[in-house]
Regions:
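Polytopic transmembrane helical bundles with strong interfacial aromatic enrichment
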Residues: 1-241
Length: 241
């Protein structure tokens, strides 16, 4: 069943499908990020301990979440690529890795900015921070490995294997605050019965998270479509566009 489903995802079909989704994804991202940042920066009250410094949460938390979400996409696409050797998923793997690296860097950068007034330093070798930094290195290694081969298919296969092995870091990042004594607090949002964050602060975070997620989807599809055009430039269907 899965094989027949994936085999129908041809480069040509993916190109036209992504072309329809990309504008909507970016439109949703602009609306939700804009509204979320407006609420977070101008409407939400100051934190009683951190003051206005906490407001960076509306960029930091979505970035950290998407750094893991993007790697999950890399992992799934890598498995599909290795089993069924479908070009579209090879391209989706590297596109997800590129954008995942971007959000990982953004999470680390905003975390450093947030950490300076809170912890008194830009960086500590905290378990969560260290494992997130390792994630950035894994992303970069996947990208470099992919482009180190003249043959796209060989590069994709090598990158897929590394991506699957590197997935072990994802649960380490997620559970690091429970397994080790870290400066990072435990979950404060993903406790749906009683979130420990005030609703006035929570809703803007939900909006920006949805917005950044929509941006990630659009960016992955756009990057994939551009790579697809390069790889398929000598095919008839590209000439007919």
């Amino acid at each position: 069943m899965f094989k027949s489903l994936f085999e129908n995802i041809s480069p040509k079909n993916f190109y036209y499908f992504s072309s329809k989704i990309i504008p909507w994804a970016f439109l949703i991202s602009i609306i939700f990020i804009g509204y979320g940042l407006y609420l977070g920066l101008f409407v939400a009250p100051s934190d009683y301990q951190q003051g206005d410094a906490f407001r960076i949460i509306y960029v930091h938390v979505p970035s950290a979440w998407l750094s893991l979400f993007a790697y999950s996409a890399v992992f799934i696409c890598s498995i599909i690529s290795l089993i069924w050797k479908i070009k579209v998923f090879e391209i989706l793997t590297i596109a997800s890795a590129k954008n995942g690296a971007l959000f990982t860097f953004l999470a680390l950068a905003t975390g450093a900015i947030w950490g300076k007034p809170m912890w008194g330093t830009w960086w500590v070798w905290d378990a969560r921070l260290t494992s997130e930094l390792i994630l950035l290195f894994i992303y970069l290694a996947i990208i470099l490995l992919y482009y180190s081969f003249d043959d796209y298919r060989k590069g994709a296969k090598a990158a897929n294997i590394l991506a699957i092995v590197g997935f072990i870091n994802i649960p380490i990042i997620h559970f690091s605050v429970e397994w080790w004594n870290t400066l990072h607090q435990g979950p404060s949002v993903m406790k749906f019965s009683s979130p420990s964050i005030a609703s006035e602060m929570l809703y803007p975070l939900i909006y920006t998270t949805v917005g950044f997620t929509a941006y990630l989807v659009g960016a992955i599809l756009l990057s994939s479509r551009n790579d697809l055009i390069i790889r398929e430039k000598n095919t008839n269907w590209i000439s007919s566009i």
